Amino acid sequence: MRRPLAFLLALALLLPQGTTAAASAMPEAPNCPIYPSNDVWHSSIQNLPVHPSSATWIANMGGASRLLHPDFGGPYGYQLQITTNATPTTRVQFDYADESDDVPYPFTAGTPIEPASDAHAFMLNKDTCLLYELFAASWNGGRPTAGSGAVFDLKRHDLRPAGWTSADAAGLPIWPGVLRYDEVASGFVDHAIRFTAQRTDRSYVWPARHQAGAARDASLPPMGARFRLRNDFNVAGYSAQTRVVLTAMQRYGLILADNGSNFFFQGQVDSRWSDQLISELKRIPAGAFEAVDASSLMIDPNSGLARGANGVPLEAGWHSRWLSQSDYLVMSPGQVADFWIKFTNTGTETWNRGIWGRQANLGLNGDDKAPYRLGMAAEWLWDDRIATTTVPLVGPGEIAEFRFKVRAPMTRGTFRLNLRPVIDGTVWMEDQGVFWLIVVP
């Protein structure tokens, strides 16, 4: 077996060892993560328990037959202005000054303002990675005003002070929960998606910091509530880009962030959004969702830093820990047998099968090609890569299984396979001395 030409070409584009891409970073600001990858916005909620109030909340959000509504497409949606340290700044007069960040904003006469009633404005300084958001913004002839304003450092896990609003009723940033065309087109959305409900409880749950409820009523969802598309929802019949969005809704879910129409969610203004994507998303019923209890993810109520799935401690970047493997075998010459091995993803990055630089492979440590030369490769990826994960996505704290076949050499002896997980194009993960012995008597 020889490495395919595509692999050899990709090899020339390898990132330096240990390099990781910024979580959800945009092409316009590649050095700015949209929060660190171990932030709650990037937490997988796929395996969290269903919230006891799930059915009640959905019933009070329009019911199971209510359809999802993508509130974007064509000229509609949210726009972000990319700024720099050289962009002029100005002071803004706020209606809710006691809960707003009173700092200079890079808000100019050319800053896009949402034409809808909320009149949101979004600015990202790509030099500092500070995100500025305004609600009810107006340039007002050079004397700018807004209902409220908030500034978020996208490199940190900081939350608003408890009880403070932002440009959203939940006191959360808006832009990290907005769908962007570039991420959907890439095949990978790695964050929760912001959405709204018409009536909410007068309470909030982490990571939200503020409420704007219609009543003190536990049958209504609180701000910050997380919902996911059920795991048994079949995404197979949808177009490729729609599947990307639906997969994100299954893994990262929706986060309730404002009062508005039930099950409306937001995306970036971009003429490339397809009518098919918008149409297909509008067919998804609210009954395909369920609320989850995300409290187990919280480490500190005043921080967005989150635990991994199953409470596994996480290290920043790409990491793994051996968990278990099938038995060593005594095999006849030329015999082919099935094997499996499991590793826990103990890093903050999601392993994504099919995306170069994010796919986790089971490699032969040190790119050892001796087993291949002995004829031991049986349906391997290539000469020193044995297998990839059995599932498309393995989130932080989740368990990955690798299944593969080995052919026993034609000569007698004891043969050792030294194994190590690798993110090809990015980094080798920990060398834990994992190996297999194949005995040919």
Where in this protein do the model-derived segments appear?
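Short proline/glycine- and polar residue-rich coil/turn motifs
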Residues: 390-399, 439-440
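Short, solvent-exposed loop/turn segments enriched in Ser/Thr/Gly
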Residues: 333-340, 413-417
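Enriched for extracellular/lumenal, surface-exposed ectodomains of secreted and cell-surface proteins
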Residues: 390, 420-427
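Low-complexity, acidic Ser/Thr/Pro/Gly-rich terminal tails and inter-domain linkers that flank the onset
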Residues: 310-332
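Short, surface-exposed loop/turn segments at beta-strand-coil junctions that are enriched for proline
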Residues: 405-413
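Short, surface-exposed polybasic-aromatic patches that bind anionic ligands, especially phosphate groups
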Residues: 24-313
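Bacterial N-terminal signal peptides
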Residues: 7-17
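Short acidic, flexible loop segments centered on an aromatic residue
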Residues: 346-382, 420-423
